[in-house]
Amino acid sequence: MPSKIEKKQAAAKLRKPPRDFSYTQNRELSWLRFDNRVLDEAFDETVPLFERLKFVSIFESNLDEFLMVRVGGLSDLAELKKQPVDNKSNMTASEQVDAVMTEMPGLLTRRESIFKSIEGKLDTLGVHRARIDSLTPEERTFVTRYFQAYVSPVISPLVIDPRHPFPNLRNGALYLACGLDGVTDEESLLGLIEIPASMNRVVEIPSPTGTYSYILLEDVILACLDSCFGSYKPLDRALIRVTRNADIDPDGEGVEEEEDYRQHMKRILKKRLRLQPVVLAVSGSLEKATLKTIRKALELPRRSVFTCDIPLNLGYVFGIEGKIPEHLRNELLFTPFKPQPNPTIDMTRSIREQVLQHDKLLFYPYEAMNPFLDLVHEAAYDPECISLRITLYRVAKQSRLCESLIDAAENGKEVTVLMELRARFDEQNNIEWAERLEEAGCTVIYGSEGFKCHSKICQLTYREGMALTRLTLLGTGNFNEKTAKLYSDFMLMTAHPGIGEDANLFFRNLSLGNLRGDYRFLGVAPVGLKPLIMRGLDREIQRALAGEPARVFFKLNSLTDREVIDKIAEASCAGVRVDMIIRGISCLKPGVPGKTENVHVRSIVGRFLEHARVYAFGVDSDMIYLSSADMMTRNTEHRVEIAFPVLDPTCRALVHEYMGVQLRDNVKARSLTSDGTWVPVERKEGEKPFNSQEFLLERAYRNAESAAVASEPVAKAKPESAPVLGPKPKPQADVPKVQKVQATVIEPDLESEPEPAPQPQPQPQTVKSAPHASARREKPAGKTKAIERHRPGRVRMGLGLIGLGLKTLITGKTK
């Protein structure tokens, strides 16, 4: 007999209206269409030839991660008796895996055909990859000598027999497999050689001047395979590569007693290498019996084995870019681009002083990250700076930012770093940086169980006399010097006291493990972000129902949250125009009659990765938020994310204009149809091609040049307005219309409480000079006494930290 609770749950299900799948689609299939869109760039003949080859490599890398994480996780769920059902497509886990495997052959065939086409064209131009079946006598001699001198001493050929069982093939590693003809009448055996990852995979071959020839390490071994197995003769040969499930939950594994979280993550990373295989890739020709032996050892079905005739793992492509002959570089590569100075920031003055005067908005990769890096470096040596706090998700291997944090800690400042060790595939790098930061004296914490910290926030606190001043830095992308040159992102630098108070509360809550803080300006997931989005949509719905103009703009990487999707559909039905630019997954299908007719979805894939997240509400975008979060359930409900308002009129104008530039793109943009497929944006008659990324590149150079000219001393120079960062649709339209709109903040649903006392606006401050950022770890000559006082010895620093810990434990205060 069912219990009372079960009866109530059953009754609730009956009352709940059936879910509508007419305007939604499966996220896995939507993702595959996105990756196919990436592959489109390899087919685009307006893209330089070698850059097209890089897009093939990016497509493959994306697909690898998708198979490891998404298909790996679904494969686990497919083993359950009662499988969960996708709330966008009504498909079970096994049905989703089936659908993905059905799509795979077509994608891989398309990849192989364009790879061969591009390589053939590169070959004619003088960039040549040697194949073992077409080696010249000179090349074969070189390969044989190279193998004997460098490769043969390193490899360990293995014959699989009862005394030598099938080994655990490492995830992503390359192996050479072959059937072997034994010296007796016994059945053929299996031979395996792991391609050594410790050696350079690209082996340069002597070639005529002005050309570049190379052979891959695995092909060197293939060419000399007959000498690898002694008396055994290879019957067939191929390269194989296993992709294993990497969808492992660090928090679900349990931290062992007396094990800190860093050690726990190291153990998890080792375990990932041994998880269940998802697919097997084969390049070459193997006898059916040989392939069957491998497949059975891996416990893979036939549908999970994919064969091709091109190299496995195209990651080597990026490594040969620097080897391209100089006279071919202009033809084969994008024109080199250097991120430009932000025209509103004077890099010869204190960055802190300028942010106190006016909010600053950085726009990567078109503008350099240097103002942020220099500000943190300044703070590390500024005697008035008392603390630096930051969240880090993905960190560059060579990080100026982390070096500055280390300097700050060594200079006696309070440095708190939330290092997210669960950033997938960056765990090892983050572990290494966490250890270095901790050794330098930083307080390193690792976030909350079950909730990755994906927010991008940094706060610098200064004491000027008895007053505290806070600078808050918030980004849509990682504090990562490498990706800041490749990903399109925003960073806001502000001294706004309200945002500063919220940020201070945010860091305090993180230290206490509290995810339910109340914030006045910031929308913080997992509690406050989705309600902020819903309130913004509800406001526009009410405007539309009242007969007023209503509009919403979203710029995202992905949209999968069913509640948000349903609210967008509700807005569409109410008459709200919804424009979205979504680079990756869109589980919402626009243009469905009676459901999403007023929704328009575009995607832009080009030279740079579109990564910024923008939420804008209102016809004049009077509410603009930038965010670290996509509208995916994992971001809105299961991560620590931050959406932050853009309140400064100049910064708001830049974001508003950026939205318009993106919507004008008719070269790299694609439009999503009501059946879930992407199609090129059609140009109107007489409309000129407009590539938004190229426009922003050119504009960054123009702005930097204008700012440089404006900064030069000129006799009796007339006062000029700040340079306008954007196109001027009409003469003298120096200031975009949005600057005249009063900024609005979505108020949180808080119980009535006394208004906080008004805080005075911070005034510009004169600060002591900090060492130039290019000095990196070098300490400035002639340190001030104030800095010397901030540099206690190891014993004194240790006693100070113990005292601070006891004070915090007793009073709950950190100051």
Whereabouts are the PLM-identified features?
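Active-site glycine- and acidic-residue-rich loops that bind
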Residues: R562
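Hydrophobic alpha/beta core scaffold segments
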Residues: R577-I581
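N-terminal localization/anchoring segments of enzymes in phospholipid and broader phosphate metabolism
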Residues: P2-V552, E570, A574, S586-K815
